[in-house]
Structures are given as C-alpha cells and as structure tokens.
Amino acid sequence: MLTRIVLFAITNIAVLILASIVMSLLGVNPTQMSGLLVMALILGFGGSLISLLMSKAIAKHTTGAYVIEQPRNPSQRWLLDTVRRQAEIVGIGMPEVAIYEGPEINAFATGADRNNALVAVSTGLLQNMSQDEAEAVLGHEIAHVANGDMVTMALLQGVLNTFVIVLARVVGGFIDSLLSGNRGGGRGVAYYGIVLVLELLFGLFATIITMWFSRRREFRADEGGAYLAGRNKMIAALERLGINHGQSTLPTQVQAFGIYGGIGEGLRKLFLSHPPLSERIAALRMARE
C-alpha cells in the first residue's frame, strides 16, 4: 500500500510539473491556475475514488451476484475453502465469495480494501471448468486483490482524469486566444467547444494508457494464479477460456477485473483491458522454461 501511495504522489507531482511547463510555454499566468487545479483534482479523483469505494455494491447490483454465506452444496463449499486457502497464502483477509448467473466462463474481483474484497464466479465457469482450472482462475482473482490492482487502477484513472481536465483547458485557452485575438482572459462560446473536443481527444489517449496498464496487470495476475494453483492449471484454464470464450457479458464497471475481457483486432486491441489469451499462455510457458 505504501508503494502505491508513493507512486501516486510522484505521479501527481509529475503532472503538476508538466502542467507548469505547459503553462509557461503558452504564457499562462500560474496564479490563475490554482482554482483550475483544485477543480481538476476534485473532479479527476472524485469519480474514480467514489467508484472504488462503491465497487463491491455496484458489482453485486449489476451482476446480480449472491454472496455465499453458508454453502448449500459441495461446489459452494469447495469455492469457499479454495478462496480461504489462497487468501491465507498471500496474506489477505478472507474475501466475500459470490456466484452470478452468466453463460460465459468468467470471474472477477473488486473492492477498495485488499482485506475486504469480493471474488465472484459465473455459473458458466462452474459448469464448464474442472476444479483444477477453476482453482487457477480463483488464484488469478486473488492475485488481483493481493496486488491491490483495484486501488492502483483508481489512482491511475484519477491522475489521468486530472491531467485531461487541466491540459484541455490550458491548451483550449491558448487556441481560443489565437483564434479570437482575445488575451484578456474572457472566454467565449468557442472556448468551451474547443475544451470539449480536447477533453474527448485527450480522454481517448488516457483510455489507451489505462488499458495498456490493465493488460500489464493481467500478466501479473496470471503469474499469481500460477503461483497459487500451479502453472499447468493456469495454462489449462486460459486454454479452456480460448475454447469456450464468447463475448463477455460482465457489466462495464467490473469487466476490467474479470479473467476474460473479450477479443479485438487492429486498433481495437488498444482499448482492451485484457491481452489476447494466446499472449497470456505464451508468457506463462516462457516463464516456465
């Protein structure tokens, strides 16, 4: 947790330094930026942190997942025992374990606290995977929790949101001044239109960065699953996903934390939260050699 906080602080300092450089190059008075920076920080981090704090409730509501309080059958008992054992190995609190209705093979983890997380699996996973394969998937999700990926993603999104808000308005003000010849600080309708376009453009690049980081996260979680369940089991689980994949039906709010995130070609690959299954399998096999 301390490492993530330090990284978060360093990244924010870098954003502020970059914003100061841009303002200096564009001739913007830094004293006029204090209000913008405060607004950007509030808006940039407000949404991502609120989403993080509410992530478990949102996930349960959007997927219809029900938490296993008392196991009703051997399958549910096995789920609880496996998650408990893996959580003890990595030194985190026992997550809530839930099942949600879904034909695809998938699972996800979420939560703002690594000691109070949620791990959920689809009914499709329980019906189509062997216990060895399911154990590896659970290990993958437990690795996400142990690595603090949900918190890291929220902090990254907050930093990028702040950057987009500040940069769009600084550059938008500069362009508006060039077009209108108005350097007195007053803003017309054109300024807000320019800012909107720039926010969409910079937001697109921010999404590409976020998804790139998410794909790196998945390789690390696969390694965690291999550690907790065994490398061969993790490879077999990913191969099973390749056979029985189909389009993910997870809601957008939790899709990035599923074991499977869909497929894409060309430029669409830049916006995928998960690497291709073939690359994930190859990475696991390469690490074994």
From Swiss-Prot:
Zn(2+) binds at H140, H144, E218. Its EC number is 3.4.24.-. One of its GO terms (biological process) is proteolysis. GO terms for molecular function: metalloendopeptidase activity; zinc ion binding. One of its GO terms (cellular component) is plasma membrane. Its main location: membrane. It comes from Xylella fastidiosa (strain Temecula1 / ATCC 700964). It is an enzyme of class 3 (hydrolase). Binds 1 zinc ion per subunit. Its cofactor is Zn(2+). It is a multi-pass membrane protein. Pfam families: Peptidase_M48 (PF01435). HAMAP family: Pept_M48_protease_HtpX (MF_00188). NCBIfam families: PRK05457.1 (NF003965). Gene3D superfamilies: Metalloproteases ('zincins'), catalytic domain (3.30.2010.10). The chain crosses the membrane at residues 5-25, 33-53, 155-175, 193-213. Belongs to the peptidase M48B family. The active site is at E141. InterPro entries: HtpX_protease, Pept_M48_protease_HtpX, Peptidase_M48. It is found in: Cell inner membrane. Keywords: Cell inner membrane, Cell membrane, Hydrolase, Membrane, Metal-binding, Metalloprotease, Protease, Transmembrane, Transmembrane helix, Zinc. It comes from the Bacteria. This is Protease HtpX.
